[in-house]
């Protein structure tokens, strides 16, 4: 198999006509969630690699198999230099929120909110208002949960989205706010966010900064800069 990318969470390979995502940790529920979310999105006409199967070696490894698509990588610079591409991203995120999902899904409250609070703890400023706001949000629509440009790409000029690891029931507007929170606010001339979504973008940029500090990522300076651009005066 050909290694495509590697992270702390997983390794991705190409195996002929298939894309293989091997989780580095034994978390069956995570594999199950990603498979279900990917398959559901695909069924709703979202352009995403088709889920094939999950290979399980008990207590050892989990491998999710998808069809391989020759996706062209994208960067934030690509989006900022192409207003049509930015519009395409927004349209895709709006379409994601229309996906029907299990209304009894508690992943937002049982995992994501707790993870956000933990990431706030790595920041050297008071984040209580951020935490209170996050806890006040009501999960009501399907969300991808990690909508950065690095989980998107182009296939024949059509936008592809993948890595539905956090696919779940979440707050309306979350995916759009998340995507915008990965970009310096000053670089976006038309970001089409409501006041509530702007508030979410500010908080998400703080979460992403805390996450970078937690993981000691090289992106800490740029994420700090992005947070400062979204921070309310």
Q: What role is predicted for each listed range?
A:
Residues 27-44:
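The N-lobe alphaC helix and its flanking beta3-alphaC-beta4 segment of protein kinase-like domains
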Residues 6-32:
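ATP-binding glycine-rich loop module of kinase domains
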Residues 50-62:
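Short beta-strand micro-motifs within the conserved protein kinase catalytic domain, predominantly
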Residues 29, 87, 178-233:
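Helix-rich C-terminal or lid/interface subdomains of diverse kinases
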Residues 98-145, 150, 155:
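An alpha-helical support segment within catalytic cores of ATP-dependent transferases
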Residues 38, 64-72:
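Short pocket-lining segment of the protein kinase catalytic domain that shapes the ATP-binding cleft
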